[in-house]
Amino acid sequence: MFAIAPADPDSPDARVLLAELGAALAHITGSDGSASFDAADVRGPRACFLVARAADGSLAGCGALRSLTDDVAELKRMYARPGSGAGAGAALLAALERQALAFGYRDVWLETRRVNARAVAFYEKHGYRVIHNFGKYAGRPEAVCLGKRPDTRAPVFL
């Protein structure tokens, strides 16, 4: 069981998780991904940054949503800390999808690198499908974009 709550992306806990995510991404892809994340994007209306904690209170992961279009939220900085317990990533993803629906988005899109096979498999397992590369990812063969229309019958989390 995980407690998931909004947090400031510049909070000490968020900075720890984002630094770990950056190091993991740099190891897998050669880039920490920080150039594609602006904390201001997840502070505005119809945006959020969430932190997950395990039952013992330890940090388990983070994730964010930002507005891409009126109908589409972009998932950013999704990270489940290794050793945080089974289900941290799934719990965070479900919370972010519920929040996207609460904000009025129809779809959730994201980008990751093709070489990050574990992430691609995780999202596909949770119903995401490969879509056209959008925005700055268009024409970039190393990028893979995925999207999903979340279940509108799920209860709102936040």
Model-derived segments and spans:
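Conserved acetyl-CoA binding element of GNAT-fold acetyltransferases
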Residues: 66, 71-82, 111
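Conserved beta-strand in the GNAT
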Residues: 49-51, 58-66, 74
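Short, P/G- and charge-enriched loop/turn segments at secondary-structure junctions
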Residues: 36-40, 132-134
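C-terminal "cap" of GNAT-fold acetyltransferases
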Residues: 2-3, 9-10, 106-109, 113-121, ...
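Short amphipathic alpha-helix that is part of the acyltransferase structural core
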Residues: 1-33, 155
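A short helix-loop-beta-strand connector motif used in the catalytic cores of GNAT acetyltransferases and
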Residues: 40-51
